[in-house]
Amino acid sequence: MASDTPESLMALCTDFCLRNLDGTLGYLLDKETLRLHPDIFLPSEICDRLVNEYVELVNAACNFEPHESFFSLFSDPRSTRLTRIHLREDLVQDQDLEAIRKQDLVELYLTNCEKLSAKSLQTLRSFSHTLVSLSLFGCTNIFYEEENPGGCEDEYLVNPTCQVLVKDFTFEGFSRLRFLNLGRMIDWVPVESLLRPLNSLAALDLSGIQTSDAAFLTQWKDSLVSLVLYNMDLSDDHIRVIVQLHKLRHLDISRDRLSSYYKFKLTREVLSLFVQKLGNLMSLDISGHMILENCSISKMEEEAGQTSIEPSKSSIIPFRALKRPLQFLGLFENSLCRLTHIPAYKVSGDKNEEQVLNAIEAYTEHRPEITSRAINLLFDIARIERCNQLLRALKLVITALKCHKYDRNIQVTGSAALFYLTNSEYRSEQSVKLRRQVIQVVLNGMESYQEVTVQRNCCLTLCNFGIPEELEFQYRRVNELLLSILNPTRQDESIQRIAVHLCNALVCQVDNDHKEAVGKMGFVVTMLKLIQKKLLDKICDQVMEFSWSALWNITDETPDNCEMFLNFNGMKLFLDCLKEFPEKQELHRNMLGLLGNVAEVKELRPQLMTSQFISVFSNLLESKADGIEVSYNACGVLSHIMFDGPEAWGVCEPQREEVEERMWAAIQSWDINSRRNINYRSFEPILRLLPQGISPVSQHWATWALYNLVSVYPDKYCPLLIKEGGMPLLRDIIKMATARQETKEMARKVIEHCSNFKEENMDTSR
């Protein structure tokens, strides 16, 4: 099972400081600009962590607000020292790098920072004397500067500008630079001249860059240990250059087989060259390549027995010449991954769960197009088979969703995989901490990607969690998201149905403060709009029934929500639904349950005192819908109205006495052993009807309700009745002159039931 170990003190302090910057590390100058407190000095370990966690929070936590001048906290290396920072996405702009230009950075990773322009190239020079590792992956605009010549016009722009490619920048002066990633740069950046000043490169990533002449790579043949040429259109000339790089330990010439057509085919001869010439090779990625058949032995020829990673037994013929198994071999979407004997400790591929997880792990950061397809394979494994490495799978999917929250394919496949990876079959293997991470990443997806499939998958995944208890730590956020999804203009019925179900569950077992807060978010109004839309369409489906059920739950002992229901035309919708759907029993039960909550609020009862409403409630006393539920709830509504006394009876028809008689008749017709579709959290609204003589029928209804519940569900309701002080009130009824004899008899039976229960469950242990 996953560990539930608490967060480290460092992690908690870092998070707190970042969420309270102007109250901890800094202060606001001119109400806008952050400045570090003058008495603070932070070492590089803390500064690096603050920056990297800040980036993580901005990109992964939608409830975290970035601060425009955050990086100004680190402008002075005498008080704050940065050495290794990883920045990503649109969070980072030119002025942010400019703010930290005095720092002696050793490692700077900029990933998909598309807002960086050529201004940042000049800032990079500030780090040239210390920088060892640099990544500009996906920073597609960093080699552009903006100009606004008179001849450049664009009627759609307020300030027309032209982007001009900077061609004179080189890495001159970056004498310590060893690791460089230029992946996903634009094609016409002059790579050769750009890199020429670097004398001792050890690692180079040119993913997605097309160059017909790779001869310039040989200048690092004695130093280059890692070369990534993902999605480069290779030729035999490229291969001739690569095999001269005899120090290589990691070579990646993989490609995305769906992105475009590549003429180059991997042959047995090419693989043999790699093995012969690159004697230090430990990692090779040839994913996505078309492999000619002569590279492997046939299934018939493969040695029987246990799978082996020994090169001598390799099913891939050229790899039999390896001196030792590879640490990693990338074979995703490559037919070789399905062979039996592969000489590598770790293989990415699509043959089985292990290979698929290796693929997700290897490609998540920089190759979302590959990762989404790997996650789709994991989805099939979790759906059809059983996931044997659940915790690893969950963590990898969470990481991918965090890393690519605006990538549709990742969000669709990732949210679908999470649905299967969090179902009840795997529940015992997951810690509270891990399940909370899933919830947060699901909510991030719902918040940042307004797409039907993603929203549906996320809602379905939330259904796998205990509601409301597992969602309580994000309670407000969940409700806000669900209410936004339930905008009636949306046409997707399946999402509406799931979202209403979730809303209903979220307000079913929470305290009144939560219900009031959700009511103020627009919960009541949203449900009423859904009901109104269904009425117009003359449809009574699960959305309609769940909406009334949700209103029943959210109005329970919550007067403000009850008032909101009345103010927003709730009673008209009740009457219209009753008329339009006379045979829908569950609908009637939910509506009457809700009106029972409204009737419990003394200040609102006058609004129910109309001839039309009283007649409807009286007629429903004779309803046999859903057992006794509709009749019982109608009688409950009338019992609270009767409790206000004859002087509050403001209608001529029907007469109070006539309604009383119908209530007595209804109560006498009910089976005391009826099993109930109801859940009382408190008896307080019922108990307040006991100590009074103004309405004996209300007193009788309340006593009958208690008798039924303690008889059928003694374990639940006997303790509740005793706890809430019901026993003395029942004893008082027996002494009351105004109480009916049958009411007194019923009160005795309730007391007897609870007394027997108390004796049977008395703890006699010493």
UniProtKB/Swiss-Prot annotation:
Matches recorded under Pfam families: LRR_Zer-1, ZER1-like_2nd
Gene Ontology terms: biological process: positive regulation of proteasomal ubiquitin-dependent protein catabolic process; protein quality control for misfolded or incompletely synthesized proteins
Entry superkingdom: Eukaryota
ARM repeats: 427-467, 511-556, 558-600, 602-643, 714-756
Chain positions of LRR repeats: 226-245, 246-268, 278-302
GO cellular component: a single term: Cul2-RING ubiquitin ligase complex
Keywords: Acetylation, Leucine-rich repeat, Repeat, Ubl conjugation pathway
Modified residues (N-acetylalanine): A2
Subunit annotation: Interacts with the ELOC-ELOB/Elongin BC complex. Part of an E3 ubiquitin ligase complex including ZER1, CUL2 and Elongin BC.
Sequence similarity: Belongs to the zyg-11 family.
Task performed by this protein: Serves as substrate adapter subunit in the E3 ubiquitin ligase complex ZYG11B-CUL2-Elongin BC. Acts redudantly with ZYG11B to target substrates bearing N-terminal glycine degrons for proteasomal degradation. Involved in the clearance of proteolytic fragments generated by caspase cleavage during apoptosis since N-terminal glycine degrons are strongly enriched at caspase cleavage sites. Also important in the quality control of protein N-myristoylation in which N-terminal glycine degrons are conditionally exposed after a failure of N-myristoylation.
Protein name (record): Protein zer-1 homolog
The species this protein was found in: Pongo abelii
The gene coding this protein: ZER1
